């Protein structure tokens, strides 16, 4: 059952996903994004930043040098990224996880811009 308008919208969405090959594109861009997060984590320090995710649903978990969840750093990074034009929220019980869920149409340029801004914000936060 369902409303005809809702069904029509769902079918149009499915056609768009298929015609633009968005599932495969999502997997490709997600891997690129995750690889960039891993490189960034290596520069910042793996004990401080732990990237993970699948497709375009990615996260970066932040810790202090003593291993404690770094909710304060996550909040500072979120505020800095907001001022740079990126919207994200800290997640998890201690709020030390930066979650990234870009649209399926995100491109390499946008990912690169976000990684640069994130790198600056993390560097400032951990200094």
Task: Show which residues each predicted segment covers.
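Conserved N-terminal phosphate-binding loop of PLP-dependent enzymes in the Aspartate aminotransferase
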Residues: 1-127
């Amino acid at each position: 059952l369902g409303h005809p308008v809702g069904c029509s919208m769902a079918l149009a969405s499915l056609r768009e996903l298929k015609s633009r090959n968005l599932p495969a594109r999502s997997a490709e861009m997600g891997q690129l994004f995750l690889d960039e997060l891993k490189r960034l984590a290596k520069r910042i320090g793996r004990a401080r930043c732990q990237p993970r995710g699948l497709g375009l649903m990615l996260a970066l978990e932040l810790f202090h040098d003593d291993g404690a969840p770094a909710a304060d750093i996550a909040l500072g990074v979120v505020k800095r990224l907001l001022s740079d034009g990126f919207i994200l929220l800290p997640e998890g019980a201690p709020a030390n996880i930066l979650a990234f869920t870009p649209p399926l149409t995100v491109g390499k340029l946008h990912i690169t811009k976000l990684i640069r801004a994130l790198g600056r914000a993390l560097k400032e936060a951990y200094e």
